[in-house]
Amino acid sequence: MALALCRMSHSPLLNLPGPRLDLLDEVHAAIAEAAEFVRAYDPDLVVIFSPDHYNGFFYRAMHPFCIGMYASAVGDYGTHIGALDVPTDLAADCAKAVLGADVDVAVSASMDVDHGTVQPLEKLFGTATARPVIPIFINAIAAPLGPLRRCRALGTAVGTFLSTLDLRVLVIGSGGLSHSPPVPTLHSADPQVRERIVHGQPLTPAQRQARQTVVMEAAKSFAAGNSDLQPLNPAWDQRFLEIIDNGHLSDLDRWSNSFVTHEGGSLAHEIRTWISAFAAMAVAGPYQTKVRYYKQAADLIAGFAIRTAVPIP
């Protein structure tokens, strides 16, 4: 087995008008550097740890973790719509191995994924279907959330399974860092929205357009400093990245969910995908990060970060 990693933030605003062109140029240049790393590595298989934003997973049965044996993209924010190339038998074997490692994970033979999964695939490969991919959902939005150490355990179990394969595997993690965009919660949503995030009715084109408009307006206000959204926290982001870069993943076990929310915002819990991805990478031994990028990107409502990593020879 060969193993490499690429971790990157995502933002629907990368696909929408509004962000400053100089910021987009800088972010896209960093993504291009990561994409070149991926191109040179040329993986046979991709495993992506990613969240969802009430497009595929809902409160009617909100799993902490779920491995997709089939997946289809919903096409939000201009991303790919339709089936991904999921190797069903291999995904099922991965789930069996993870369960055998005492990590409770659900499986799905009909997983819907959104931009949190698809955007990194498109940015790194050009298309979302360029490589076989096993999608692994991590709940990072719908409270109650489990402790961060369970995300590390998930990643270790997945990495142990990957170590048995005679394949070149790229592990991707998607999301983070500090950000608190306008996403509904079970307790704050109005009755119509609450019904949708519980029971999962698909958005109509008009509803999806309205949601997109809300995000664009929120980003405009946030970048102008006229927003009630929780500010970004670059100091906290850098602290997290330092822990990741140094391979001290167990240090994050001490971070409570309330601490993550207080310091990083409501969706900073997407760092869970980073923890799982780097824990999978660590199964191959000590690693070194290569591409390192961070930007306090108010226009994207995110502390936007990218890391690539390979095992230390």
UniProtKB/Swiss-Prot annotation:
Pathway: Aromatic compound metabolism; 3-phenylpropanoate degradation
InterPro entries on file: DHPP/DHXA_dioxygenase, Xdiol_dOase_suB
Coiled-coil regions, chain positions: none
Enzyme Commission no: 1.13.11.16
Keyword Oxidoreductase found: yes
Cofactor(s) required, per the database record: Fe(2+)
SUPFAM superfamilies in the record: LigB-like (SSF53213)
The family this protein is said to belong to: Belongs to the LigB/MhpB extradiol dioxygenase family.
Xref: NCBIfam families: PRK13370.1-4 (NF009910)
Protein name in UniProt: 2,3-dihydroxyphenylpropionate/2,3-dihydroxicinnamic acid 1,2-dioxygenase
Organism of origin: Mycobacterium ulcerans (strain Agy99)
Upper lineage: Bacteria, Bacillati, Actinomycetota, Actinomycetes, Mycobacteriales
